[in-house]
Amino acid sequence: MSLQINTPDWILHANAPLRDLNTFHIQAQARWLLEIIHPTALPQALTHPHIVGLPILVLGSGSNVLLAANPEECVLRFVNREVTILEHRINHALVRAGAGMAWHDLVLWSLQQGLSGLENLALIPGTVGACSIQNIGAYGVQVEEFVHIVEAYDQTEGQFVRLTASECEFAYRNSRFKREPNRYLIAAVEFRLPLLHELKLNYAGISEELEALQITLPEPRDVAQAVINLRRRKLPDPEVLSNAGSFFKNPYLPREQAEQLRQHHPTLPIYPGETPESNKLSAAWLIEQCGWKGIREGDAGVAPQHALVLVNYGEATGAELLALARRIAASVQERFGVAIEPETRLIGAQW
């Protein structure tokens, strides 16, 4: 029987299986798995003799990771899922959510409270803690627009810190936490959510979906339902077909280079970049043009619905999925001269 140490504030497991803790359902094992119930006890838990001094790997819901090998680190999971309104103001509210809360649960809860802002981010897998690391985004919205404070344990300084949105250094699918992965352990996030705001409807089929639902004056909850419908049609359910959502980031190119590429490929979708001098390309389009959509090699494959999504049909290993991803990226580079990189975090391997 594997060793398990239980306290009211945390639980430490030895030789813990991770298959049910990652949405690729990769069979992997953690030498130590630490589950944090009350984050205030985190410093004490980290000094336990079995794990003191070990590097830490935070695993939320495992929805954005590929376990290419057994992690050497102590795997840490926050299981604090409480959510509360800290204060109400005339036009917004401050909301605090525990790092272990499922992101979609927070979206639904905020809508039930009459708050808005997160509706375009409905049904994104993962936890509240992970949302700030990845700066999750969808349908024209990024979470950085609503983050007020991130509460984290700074392993370098040995203390809890409260970082403002600007201090989080958010960028496209990036943040301070992603650039310093071994420093901060996010315990909770505070959000500044408006009571009313201008809905973003002009992105990727939302207006058409609302029309199909016969909604002419949409409210935030209607937008959330439209997004849920769209995502369910486009992306496979990880509980049915194991996956980690979009595996690759959309690449950014200098505007001139993007336009030159479209001259050779007139149907190439191009979107505004983060600056007037850059454009964002559709990684899904590039991959599909290389013939990868729906491909299956053993139990590793690319989803038939969406070329950005790698899938595990059953017993694929993390190494097999990583090898497939590398071949996909190499083919895009060879045909289009464009480098695509993983959005999914690689554990036990480098890109």
UniProtKB/Swiss-Prot annotation:
It catalyses: UDP-N-acetyl-alpha-D-muramate + NADP(+) = UDP-N-acetyl-3-O-(1-carboxyvinyl)-alpha-D-glucosamine + NADPH + H(+). The keyword Acetylation does not apply. Gene3D superfamilies: 3.30.465.10, UDP-N-acetylenolpyruvoylglucosamine reductase, C-terminal domain (3.90.78.10), Uridine Diphospho-n-acetylenolpyruvylglucosamine Reductase, domain 2 (3.30.43.10). This is UDP-N-acetylenolpyruvoylglucosamine reductase. Its EC number is 1.3.1.98. The lineage of its organism: Bacteria, Pseudomonadati, Pseudomonadota, Gammaproteobacteria, Lysobacterales. NCBIfam families: murB, PRK00046.1, PRK13903.1. PANTHER family: UDP-N-ACETYLENOLPYRUVOYLGLUCOSAMINE REDUCTASE. It comes from Xylella fastidiosa (strain 9a5c). GO terms for biological process: cell division; cell wall organization; peptidoglycan biosynthetic process; regulation of cell shape. GO terms for cellular component: cytosol. Keywords: Cell cycle, Cell division, Cell shape, Cell wall biogenesis/degradation, Cytoplasm, FAD, Flavoprotein, NADP, Oxidoreductase, Peptidoglycan synthesis. Its main location: cytoplasm.
